[in-house]
From Swiss-Prot:
Annotated pathway: Amino-sugar metabolism; N-acetylneuraminate degradation; D-fructose 6-phosphate from N-acetylneuraminate: step 2/5
EC number: 2.7.1.60
An example Gene Ontology biological process: N-acetylneuraminate catabolic process
SUPFAM superfamilies listed in its UniProt record: Actin-like ATPase domain
Record key words, sorted: ATP-binding, Carbohydrate metabolism, Kinase, Metal-binding, Nucleotide-binding, Transferase, Zinc
InterPro entries found in the cross-reference section: ATPase_NBD, ManNAc_kinase_bac, ROK, ROK_cs
Gene3D superfamilies, alphabetized: 3.30.420.40
Binding site for Zn(2+): H156, C166, C168, C173
Positions contributing to ATP binding: 5-12, 132-139
Coiled coil: none
Organism, scientific name: Salmonella arizonae (strain ATCC BAA-731 / CDC346-86 / RSK2980)
Name of the protein in its database record: N-acetylmannosamine kinase
Amino acid sequence: MTTLAIDIGGTKLAAALIDKNLRISQRRELPTPGSKTPGALREALTALVEPLRTEAHQVAIASTGIIQEGMLLALNPHNLGGLLHFPLVQTLETITGLPTLAVNDAQAAAWAEYHALPDDIRDMVFITVSTGVGGGVVCDGKLLTGKGGLAGHLGHTLADPHGPVCGCGRVGCVEAIASGRGMAAAARDDLAGCDAKTLFIRAGEGHQQARQLVRQSAQVVARLVADVKVTTDCQCVVIGGSVGLAEGYLEQVRAFLMQEPAPYHVALSAARYRHDAGLLGAALLAQGDTL
């Protein structure tokens, strides 16, 4: 059975066909529309999947935000251009005429990455550091989603009570500081207006402010890793996302984690499936891997 998998992120939309052996083909990408209207997202999704829908038997969506009874509810609306509510499952079923499943993108990625780990790993946490910061928790071999779909939204745990206001309305969230959007918002002087990708380039060139912004992000994520270790007693933490997978970033997170007391230490690794983890995890769930 072929699955049309869709990944809805803060900066891009991706889609691909995935077969029962998790082989990916015909991968496509489009920018996430900046408009706040549901119509703009609907049009973008239609353009994204139209060339693929006739070859699929079902649709699986991994999306930023909270997925609740098929609705996309944004905890931080800034990550989707201000969109608050969107009938995600209904929209894709209308566009494709196919049965559709939707799950949070970090939860989906956690499920994919869990399947790539050795069989003796039953407890793991996935953290994505990208436009926002998200997470997924697997406990005793089961993916935790929560009754309201909120489980694993680790980016909205507290990093600094005196920090910047997060898009969710809370002050000092991990996401407000460590995410690509948070790093860009903190950039000043000659870096003002730069995106996270540019900040990493400038940091690599030795720019002191850029290096400090990257260090601050890595330190906040390391503290988050320590928190999830002591909360879940996970056997490992997998880091993904465009920031999380940037050159040298994981090494900085690991170095900061080693400064914490020993009980907070945990094995860290980069996402095996990298930017395809959300697509693959959603496909796994649609193909019968139960939550």
